[in-house]
Amino acid sequence: SDSLPSFGRSGSASFVLNDRLYLVGGKHALGAATDEVWSYDAVTSAWIQEANFTFGALWRASACAYNGKGFMLFGRDENNQFQQGFYSFDPITNQWESLPSFPSLGRSHAALFALNDGVYACFGIDSLGNSHNDLWKFNEIGNEWIALPGIPALGRRGGVCLTTQESMYYTTGIDETNNRLNQAWVYSPTLGIESPSLKEPTLLEVYDILGNPVAFANNQLLFERYSNGEVKKVFVIE
C-alpha cells in the first residue's frame, strides 16, 4: 500500500467507515500538532485528503465509528493543552459537528469505543496527571454523558481497546504508579465490567510504611494491596 502522502506523524486518531480508514490529527517531528484529515480507500489503495478538522489541531485524541458516523473525544491541542471536546463526523456531508463536551477535565491516552447500544469512553490521563479507572456512556437521546461503574483497579492509560458488537476488551497500558500492565478486562452492557482472569487478583494500590500512596520504587519497603484483600510486603533491591 502507498504511504501517507504527507509528513510523518504520531498520536493520530482513526476510525473506519464504509471500508474507508479515516486518520485525524497527530503530531509531526517538529512537535506541532496538525488538523489534517486523510482517508484511505482500501479498494483503490489511494489516500484522499479531506477537509481539515474544523475545531483545530489535535493529537492523542480517541476515536471510534458508530451508526455510520465517526466520533472523536479528548486529545491535546497545538499548545499541549488537554481537551474535553466531543465531535462527530458525517462522511456523506464531509462535515464535523461539535457534541456535548466530556463533563470533567480533558484527557489523552483514553479509549473511545462503540457497542451495539452506543458510544463509550474510559480511562486516560488528565491535565493534572491523574489516570482514571472510570467508564462513561454518551446518551444520544438526552445528549449527555452518563457515568457507569468503572473497573475495581488503579487508573490507567494507553492500553489496547478491542470490541465485538456486544463487548469491549481492554488490556495492557500504564497505571497511575507508572507500572506496565498485563491485565485484561471485559465490559458488556448486560454483564458489567470484570476481569476474564478472575483467579488473578488485581493490584489496587501501593503504599509506604506510613500508609501513604506512592509510586513503586526500589530500595524501600512498600506494601501492595490486591482486590482479593491480600496485602504483600515488597522490597526490591536495585
Task: Give the positions of each predicted feature.
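Kelch-like beta-propeller repeat domains
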Residues: 1-190
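Residue-level detector of functionally pivotal "anchor" positions at catalytic/ligand-binding pockets or at interdomain
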Residues: 187-214, 237
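Short linear motifs in exposed loops
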Residues: 25, 74, 215-217, 235
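Short, surface-exposed beta-edge/turn micro-motifs
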Residues: 109, 218-221
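Short cationic/low-complexity microdomains
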Residues: 153-167, 201-216
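Short aromatic-centered micro-motifs
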Residues: 15, 64, 206, 224-225
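C-terminal tail/sorting-segment detector
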Residues: 221-238
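Generic N-terminal leader/processing signal
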Residues: 67, 197, 230-231
